[in-house]
Amino acid sequence: MFLDPVINFFGTVLEMFRSGGVITYLIAAIGIYGFITALEKIHYLRKISRVSTPQIIGAVNESMEKGGALEALREIGQYQNPVSKIISEALKIGYRNRSEVEDAMERVFIVEMSNMTRGLGTLRTIIEVAPMLGLIGTVIGIWYTFRALGVNADPAAMAEGIYVALITTILGLAVAIILMPLYSYITGRIDDEIDKIELIKKMTNWGYAVMRISVEGNVDDVVKALMESDGVVSVRVVDEPDANVVVAFKPSMLEKSINNIIIERCGKSAEIIESKLRQ
């Protein structure tokens, strides 16, 4: 029957495990766990890289031209990957000074790095430990062989010892040989994602921002304080239902956020009505 070769193969494998002893089962168990871990990690990395970085950047730039940061946030909310999360964080607080934006992006980066590298240490350990377990099985098999070479030499016992030594060695090496290319592939994909993130962190240094704010009372001192601040390009008073000051500035050049400047220099608080970031 056509099933005979398959049945014979599995029968041979079971016989190998029975003959190899506990070490064989242990190597097989960690090998299966490592293989499953590798497949899960590959699936995760393929999922987060499904959308290209240029596609995300294009969507952000187009959205910012239409409706500013809020529109861009809505647009990239559909992309759940490290690049989109870094950009989202920069958009959320992009009107603040550069150090605050960088700190926020760094926090997201740390979280995403943890997600990407989770399980890698275990996988690497399995690759290193499996051959060592095989070596232990080899030593045990040799011990069986020498014990059989006693006063009454037993050829069957000698053969069993050699068999144990060979099986455990082969299985340990096989686990390492199978998992090592998967590990290399995973680390390569992670490095690619890190390169993308580093590029995005540099690209999110927005050229300038326009903010509409509402300040209670006289705004002359607010206008003066803002104009004297580094990074502020222009300030103008407007008569709008929800805002009375519009300020344009370069986020990367601000020492403090716009709101903090107003609080510290004027003793007033400002309500941010709208902020738009521009490349």
Swiss-Prot record:
Its main location: membrane. One of its GO terms (biological process) is protein import. It comes from the Archaea. InterPro entries: ExbB/TolQ_transport, MotA_ExbB_proton_chnl. The chain crosses the membrane at residues 19-39, 126-146, 162-182. Keywords: Cell membrane, Membrane, Protein transport, Transmembrane, Transmembrane helix, Transport. It is found in: Cell membrane. One of its GO terms (cellular component) is plasma membrane. Pfam families: MotA_ExbB. It is a multi-pass membrane protein. Belongs to the ExbB/TolQ family. This is Putative biopolymer transport protein ExbB homolog. The lineage of its organism: Archaea, Methanobacteriati, Methanobacteriota, Methanomada group, Methanobacteria.
